[in-house]
């Protein structure tokens, strides 16, 4: 298997993301590449980030509900990119809008 993150199979390598409270989310590395920040951290052979070697990233400033919504967006984006079907609305709880915007900016999503 190639060490290039762009060639990983969607279901091969898993990544663990942790919220500020330590809640663990497990997803495929490929799904997380919607985030430019995460993709850079996991950039393969030349990556010096500990996150790439441990397959886990801890977000001290992102709450569990916000990180959960971010991950839902990763799956939404992967499903509907290049889709010919109508794009459904992506629901967002008003209580997390500002925090979600900040997280999206940080994650380059």
From Swiss-Prot:
Its main location: nucleus. One of its GO terms (molecular function) is protein-macromolecule adaptor activity. InterPro entries: ELC1, SKP1-like, SKP1/BTB/POZ_sf, Skp1_comp_POZ. SUPFAM superfamilies: POZ domain. It is found in: Nucleus. One of its GO terms (cellular component) is elongin complex. GO terms for biological process: ubiquitin-dependent protein catabolic process. Transmembrane segments: none annotated. SMART domains: Skp1. It comes from the Eukaryota. Keywords: Nucleus, Transcription, Transcription regulation, Ubl conjugation pathway. Gene3D superfamilies: Potassium Channel Kv1.1, Chain A. CDD domains: BTB_POZ_EloC. Belongs to the SKP1 family. SIII, also known as elongin, is a general transcription elongation factor that increases the RNA polymerase II transcription elongation past template-encoded arresting sites. Subunit A is transcriptionally active and its transcription activity is strongly enhanced by binding to the dimeric complex of the SIII regulatory subunits B and C (elongin BC complex). The elongin BC complex seems to be involved as an adapter protein in the proteasomal degradation of target proteins via different E3 ubiquitin ligase complexes. This is Elongin-C. It comes from Dictyostelium discoideum (Social amoeba). The lineage of its organism: Eukaryota, Amoebozoa, Evosea, Eumycetozoa, Dictyostelia. The gene is tceb1.
